[in-house]
């Protein structure tokens, strides 16, 4: 039976007053109280995992208990930081904060590797009055905050120790469309993280936009391993609260160690009639294709029920999608299952995805024209052909336009500009950063083109600047790259993903997806570059021209291969393909290149570590993506 969405009328999302996810969960507790809400697959003690379940009635009771306790000890407007391991208690903590009417801040257990500096920075920024954690993690959390002054030290509450009986004192919080529900901290790798203020209107709006794009139906089941502190992981797991059916999750580490766990959970279960949906960044598809295919001695899989897996959070590789489909087509996976998508924290999460009945769209455009900010389609075998993956169509009741930032004017299809967004899923600003909020969230589109993509949006509406380059081509949205990551050498634009792809395709010695391309002023290059005759550059203290640097992690089993042939292959491929000289090729060991908390290559952090020498010496501190047990 098709999912009837009473909140979408004539292409517009309309909610009753004071709507929030709390009311949705309470509805399911009343009408489906004895049905499964969430299942956590715990692989920390058993290789095959232990199922830890919670019913809708139990979930409601635990949420009300934690919400009531927070109402007793905190004030409206207080920030509630969630420093839990990824399990059922994390979800109860997040919803408990929503039930209390306070502002949730989804973070992570301080025991997670690679995140300590980020966690301190976020706590400094949001100044929570209370931290929610578990009994097992409470001691570690208290040690983590011990360095803070007594006045700044938040209260620590173990949610699993809150008696369910406390739920009887809970009061339904008052919330309007401008009330902040939670702060979603961005995954930036060089600046102090910014907390996007997501309201009680933004959150259900974006959840509905995702469900509408996935054509959610009665009986559909969600599956995820993504971290809850990341926007894609959080919104994906919250889909169940609106759809009202079960959702299964595991930790990121459980997936990374054995990606077949994710694949097996996506497969049809006995007696199931609905489909499954999920979301993952691009690397996960390659990882699953390489290591997640069932062994001959394992039970058979039926993946014909997989409706859609949103592929987002990092650039989408056509090769990775092909490998994934080829690996799992024998098990019934449909070619339409993988959905290249676009989203960002400032939009709560979701902006666009590939329509359900379409396979991923891959076109080829001319590289020279692309670097001139134009999309010109060419044959796949053309000399300058560059593959571009469509991010699909924009969600219901949301608008995306391509803008010339100098004039704030909409650009016609085929021209590349900054992507601006409008809709009720867009956050209202960055926590405590008024100037930055105004620059990002409060922009006016000064002119529109005929057949504008802003059609239906108010003339005086506020638009959010994404910081991403993109264009429309043949009705689809394409993402060209981050504005701040653009490599400009000798006046020519180069997209870093394009350079990185050429580098990794030129040699088998690099890990796929672990290459960073960026530019550095010539006078900031290390002396080693000027001593290398292959670099073709002499030191001049006044030379500030930007020079290209490629950093790549060595693939497994290649650490003994000689450096020079690898560097020569990379230099030659980029010189031929892009007409630019690589001044330095730095090969580092696996795990060295900085990553953002969402798993993306941290190009700006990599550039900083390169300039200060810590990357070459091997003492940089990359963010570790795989967290949890």
From Swiss-Prot:
Its EC number is 6.2.1.20. The keyword ATP-binding applies. One of its GO terms (biological process) is fatty acid biosynthetic process. The keyword Protein biosynthesis does not apply. GO terms for cellular component: plasma membrane. One of its GO terms (molecular function) is adenylyltransferase activity. ATP binds at residues 186-191, 341, 345, 468, 482. InterPro entries: AMP-bd_C_sf, AMP-dep_synth/lig_dom, ANL_N_sf, FAAL/FAAC, FAAL_FadD32. Keywords: ATP-binding, Fatty acid metabolism, Ligase, Lipid metabolism, Nucleotide-binding. The acyl-AMP ligase activity is inhibited by the alkylphosphate esters of AMP, adenosine 50-dodecylphosphate (AMPC12) and eicosyl-AMP (AMPC20). It catalyses: a long-chain fatty acid + holo-[ACP] + ATP = a long-chain fatty acyl-[ACP] + AMP + diphosphate; dodecanoate + ATP + H(+) = dodecanoyl-AMP + diphosphate; tetradecanoate + ATP + H(+) = tetradecanoyl-AMP + diphosphate. Pathway: Lipid metabolism; mycolic acid biosynthesis. Coiled coil: none annotated. Pfam families: AMP-binding. Monomer. Belongs to the ATP-dependent AMP-binding enzyme family. Involved in the biosynthesis of mycolic acids. Catalyzes the activation of long-chain fatty acids as acyl-adenylates (acyl-AMP), which are then transferred to the phosphopantetheine arm of the polyketide synthase Pks13 for further chain extension. Can use dodecanoate (C12) and tetradecanoate (C14). This is Long-chain-fatty-acid--AMP ligase FadD32. It comes from Mycobacterium marinum (strain ATCC BAA-535 / M). The lineage of its organism: Bacteria, Bacillati, Actinomycetota, Actinomycetes, Mycobacteriales.
